[in-house]
């Protein structure tokens, strides 16, 4: 992969450079925002630099100050989604204590991120079978979460929270379910119901990893919480 071009900005510690830094960041972000908006209604193959920069409201030449090409742009968008997911997945991946509330918190965050950025997942996954570079980006994206989930499952198996089984295939199955469920519901407008997607994911994750008793407790607690909100 070619080395990424970065904005030629001197140290942000110099107050004289602060306006330039802010302007550069705003321009780059406007390009990313325009790409996301385009992807709500179009596949990646229809994206052009000219149309993108028209949507962003800046010159075509400005694009190449921030990105090598459109593939680089998509890789940046996908990395942004990955970073956001890693952040919200922290409770289950790293937290201590009862894993079910930690898993709920993680899934809540995951749904929130993908509800906002679902078109990026759809665009990359749809293009991957016909585009070698995006295929690698998508494969690497999924593998990172397969690795993280496998490690966490094995940690919980080691302390008796999860029964023994081959962790990696199960982690892969759960992650593929998450990815394609959210692509289906959040990859284009109108988007699906966030609560329904969240509940479906939690049912499968809790029952698969922690068993039917844990699922029963989770459903009972969820029902109590729902009833309390209605009062």
Give each language-model segment a name.
Residues 1-26, 165, 213-231:
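N-terminal intrinsically disordered/low-complexity leader segments
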Residues 9, 13-20, 53-71, 113-116, ...:
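Basic/polar phosphate-binding segments, predominantly the helix-turn-helix DNA-binding elements
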Residues 15-18, 41, 77-104, 121-122, ...:
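Amphipathic alpha-helical linker/stalk segments
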Residues 23-35, 52, 77-85, 149:
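Generic hydrophobic, amphipathic alpha-helix propensity
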Residues 30, 38-72, 76:
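Helix-turn-helix
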Residues 76, 87-116, 170-174, 198, ...:
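Hydrophobic alpha-helical connector segments
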Residues 83-86, 113-116, 132-158, 168-172, ...:
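Amphipathic alpha-helical packing segments from all-alpha helical-bundle domains
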Residues 102, 114-133, 150, 180-187, ...:
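Amphipathic alpha-helical segments used for helix-helix packing
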């Amino acid at each position: 992969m070619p080395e990424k071009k970065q904005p030629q900005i001197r140290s942000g510690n110099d107050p004289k450079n602060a306006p330039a830094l802010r302007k550069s960041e705003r321009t780059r972000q406007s390009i990313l925002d325009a790409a996301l908006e385009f992807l709500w209604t179009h596949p990646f193959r229809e994206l052009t630099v000219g149309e993108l920069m028209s949507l962003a409201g800046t010159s075509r030449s400005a694009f190449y100050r921030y990105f090598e090409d459109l593939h680089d742009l998509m890789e940046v968008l996908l990395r942004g989604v990955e970073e956001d997911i890693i952040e919200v997945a922290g409770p289950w991946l790293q937290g201590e204590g009862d894993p079910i509330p930690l898993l709920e918190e993680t899934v809540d965050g995951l749904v929130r991120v993908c509800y906002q950025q679902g078109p990026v997942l759809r665009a990359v996954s749809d293009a991957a079978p016909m585009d070698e570079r995006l295929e690698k980006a998508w494969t690497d994206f999924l593998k990172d979460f397969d690795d993280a989930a496998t490690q966490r499952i094995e940690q919980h198996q080691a302390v008796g929270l999860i029964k023994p089984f081959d962790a990696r295939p199960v982690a892969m199955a759960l992650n593929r379910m998450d990815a394609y469920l959210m692509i289906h519901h959040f990859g284009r407008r109108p988007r699906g119901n966030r609560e329904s997607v969240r509940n479906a994911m939690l049912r499968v994750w809790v029952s698969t990893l922690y068993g039917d008793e844990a699922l029963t407790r989770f459903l009972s607690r969820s029902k109590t919480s729902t009833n309390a909100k209605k009062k």
